[in-house]
Amino acid sequence: MASVNVDFEQAGELKIGQVGIANLRVRTLDVPRLVQEMRERVTRAPKLFGRAAVILDFGGLSQVPDLATAKALLDGLHEAGVLPVALAYGTSEIDLLSQQLGVPLLAKFRAQYESAAVSPPPPPPARAEPAPPAARPAPGRMQRTAVRSGQQLYAENCDLTVLSTVGAGAEVIADGSIHIYGTLRGRALAGAQGNPDARIFCRDFHAELVAIAGNYKVLDDVPMDLRGKAVQVWLEQDQIKIAALD
């Protein structure tokens, strides 16, 4: 079995994707610790994480786990209450591991590995051309009516403004920021394509979950004095921050 590294605060970093799939970026191959962390997440937020689809991302490890370790991790995550459905695309070793495990690779994660590869030499400088006019930003999306339980609303490449409520079990997602002028009882995911500068603004905060660029916080982690208040949510050093609006 591969060696264990216990220098991390968490063995696995869980981030929420825009289509309800979580990405578990494995930081250390400590299988019992990874499984226990996932079990605790499911216990704390069963409606959010119970039977959630999870992608395993081994890209941050110095070596790919062997087959026995990977199988033990998949079995343990199943027992913890989630459903490992794929591996994040990576090296040829991860490709082989996915075949041995009988799970697919998710091509969505291909770019993050390819960007780390050695870049080809730059082309010779060309004659300077006048810069084209800056493209106008995409107009924000506005939702005038309530977003009800089971509904999902996605604002692609723009901000999202909801003039009514977001009910429990509903999900609003934006590549930009999210502004909610009613009560937020469901989930709000801003910066869905990885924008860490996105924010969430809400007049009446009871969210099941808020996330920015995949980093999330559930209601149980929110101080009681912020519930029912007008708040803003932002990301600071990969940590979700929530504060009341003056």
UniProtKB/Swiss-Prot annotation:
Residues 116-140 are annotated as: Disordered. InterPro entries: CAP/MinC_C (IPR016098), MinC (IPR013033), MinC_C_sf (IPR036145), MinC_N (IPR007874), Septum_form_inhib_MinC_C (IPR005526). One of its GO terms (biological process) is cell morphogenesis. The keyword Calcium does not apply. Coiled coil: none annotated. Residues 119-136 have a biased composition (Pro residues). Disulfide bonds: none annotated. Keywords: Cell cycle, Cell division, Septation. NCBIfam families: minC. Belongs to the MinC family. Cell division inhibitor that blocks the formation of polar Z ring septums. Rapidly oscillates between the poles of the cell to destabilize FtsZ filaments that have formed before they mature into polar Z rings. Prevents FtsZ polymerization. HAMAP family: MinC. Interacts with MinD and FtsZ. This is Probable septum site-determining protein MinC. It comes from Xanthomonas oryzae pv. oryzae (strain MAFF 311018).
